[in-house]
């Protein structure tokens, strides 16, 4: 979530949305799946909180309480960051080999090396898509490359009998992957296929890392060796399956995102030539922004530049530009399209939050400030 907010903020302000993630040796890492892997394979030394149904809870605020980690204000950004670092340190202390393994294999090249669709070599995979009652884990077989996304490999959960999948057509596979269980109805289950995003720090491990688990632990995670091997053998005896699965995942995607503010991903990467022009714009004195004569290859950028000026340097707008901006603001705040919050809905949300009798004085003060901010917009629309 934080990455998405940061990326979009940078993008809308003409900055490179990705540079901070790779320049100067930087990289990204989301440790939640490492926490889940630790629970599944090396839980010793850590207290694992449980939900009412007995399944493990991986909520940060519950992990910190169970392990005596200071976390004074759950969901406060800085407090959450400090607590997350403390949980990572706990795992590094209690299970250093596992910690180092995940850290060293978090990039997409390591993930690619583990997911061999030619041999369908089984891989242990961690994902919130698998139920917590089963440790959020599965032994999967890499079945097919995604037909259009080179950073996505489609895998199959080897716990499940693949007979129906093997006999299904591409259209039937598509229906039983992308249709909700509620819509499929009783007696028809979704096929346990999922995409592994290579560039999103997936947590994968060789199958032999399970060799130290006791029979009781394997049973708890529903990882029966005979079942896994039998299902893998069936997949390998279906030579036409990878092509059918790839076809099923080949869905034309018509983006309904037409507003440049929303088109960080829908519009593709900004070209090097346009990036150089944007960097040049950012270097210009504020008083000259209204006089710049710059054009871009990317059709998003002219409007983004206009909005950048309007939001940050409204004094750079002249004549028709001012009218255009006020018309845009009025439309966005009073009659927004689906997905955007109107000023009226904003006020209603604040009122609903303020009605909470347990709201702290600090949070109530924040809501009052937000209410005043909303009111300050009214004279201009």
Give the ranges of each region predicted by the language model.
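Metal-dependent phosphoesterase core characteristic of DEDDh/y 3'-5' exonuclease domains
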Residues: 1-96, 105, 267, 275-316, ...
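Conserved DEDDh/DEDDy metal-dependent 3′-5′ exonuclease domain
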Residues: 1-42, 205-281, 377
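Sequence-level motif detector for i,i+2 pairs with an aromatic at +2
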Residues: 26, 150-153, 199
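Acidic catalytic cores of enzymes that act on phosphate-bearing nucleotides/polynucleotides
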Residues: 93, 104-188
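Polar helix-capping/helix-linker motif
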Residues: 95, 104, 224-225, 234-238, ...
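Structured mid-domain segments that build the active-site/substrate or prosthetic-cofactor binding neighborhood
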Residues: 177-223
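C-terminal non-catalytic accessory extensions
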Residues: 324-381
């Amino acid at each position: 979530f934080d990455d998405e907010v940061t990326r979009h903020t940078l993008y809308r302000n003409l900055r490179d949305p990705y540079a901070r993630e790779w320049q100067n040796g930087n990289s990204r890492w989301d440790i939640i799946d490492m926490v889940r892997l630790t629970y599944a394979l090396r839980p010793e030394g850590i207290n694992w909180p449980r939900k009412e149904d007995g399944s493990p809870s991986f909520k940060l605020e519950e992990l910190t309480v169970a392990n005596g980690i200071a976390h004074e204000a759950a969901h406060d950004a800085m407090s959450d960051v400090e607590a997350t670092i403390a949980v990572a340190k706990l795992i590094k202390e209690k299970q250093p080999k596992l910690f180092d393994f995940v850290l060293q294999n978090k990039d997409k090249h390591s993930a690619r090396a583990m997911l061999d669709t030619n041999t369908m070599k089984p891989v242990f995979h961690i994902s919130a898509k698998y139920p917590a009652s089963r440790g959020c884990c599965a032994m999967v077989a890499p079945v097919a490359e995604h037909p259009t996304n080179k950073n996505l490999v489609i895998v199959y959960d080897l716990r499940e009998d693949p007979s129906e999948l093997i006999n299904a057509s591409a259209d039937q596979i598509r229906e039983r992957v992308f249709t909700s269980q509620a819509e499929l109805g009783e007696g028809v289950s979704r096929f346990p296929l999922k995409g592994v995003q290579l560039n999103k720090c997936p947590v994968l491990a060789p199958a032999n890392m399970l060799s130290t688990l006791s029979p009781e632990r394997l049973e708890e995670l529903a990882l029966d060796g005979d079942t896994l091997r039998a299902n893998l053998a069936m997949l390998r005896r279906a030579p036409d399956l990878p092509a059918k699965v790839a076809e099923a995942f080949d869905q034309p995607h018509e983006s309904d995102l037409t507003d440049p503010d929303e088109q960080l991903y829908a519009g593709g990467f900004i070209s090097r030539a346009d990036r150089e022009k944007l960097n040049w714009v950012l270097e210009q004195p504020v008083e000259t922004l209204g006089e710049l004569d710059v054009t871009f290859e990317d059709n998003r950028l002219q409007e983004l530049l206009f909005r950048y000026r309007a939001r940050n340097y409204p004094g750079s707008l002249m004549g028709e530009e001012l009218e255009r901006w006020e018309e845009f603001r009025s439309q966005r705040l009073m009659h927004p399209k689906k997905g955007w919050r109107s000023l009226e809905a904003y006020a209603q949300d604040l009122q609903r939050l303020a009605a909470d009798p347990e709201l702290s004085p600090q949070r109530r003060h924040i809501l009052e400030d937000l209410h005043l901010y909303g009111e300050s917009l009214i004279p201009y629309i």
